[in-house]
Amino acid sequence: MQMHKDLPVQSLFKGCRLTSDGTIKYFNATDWDHYEDGSEVTNSIEDGNDMVELPDAYYTVVVHGDYDWEIRMSLYPLEGYTKFSKKYCSAYEAYRDGSTLYSIRNQVPTVNTNRATFLTQARIYFD
């Protein structure tokens, strides 16, 4: 149970700014107004998207009943666990500027849009 208390996978989540060319700048762990190097973070869509980096890990889903289940995560390839490769997840709800979606703080989220449109607009940034 000690590993559960320490949250080893979740403790490796890192906030960052991800640009369209793939450049990553990590936020200060306790102050997302600044990067790790101490420079100030701007709130501009031209500077990229605010994301959370999810590390390489392993997971399994344990089902206890129809509506009762849990996801177990590990840094190690335990038997029955599936590899989850590093990914980036938006830190904020999607904000649309024109036909492109962004993850930028202090913006009103885009609503009343279907899933297909959201996916198309989210992909535009990295094309």
Q: Can you name each region flagged by the protein language model?
A:
Residues 1-60, 108-127:
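Conserved hydrophobic ligand-interaction patch in extracellular adhesion modules
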Residues 37, 67-68:
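Long, low-complexity, polar/charged, intrinsically disordered or flexibly structured peripheral segments
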Residues 41-48, 70-127:
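Short aromatic-cysteine micro-motif
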Residues 60-65, 96-100:
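Short, solvent-exposed loop/turn elements at domain surfaces
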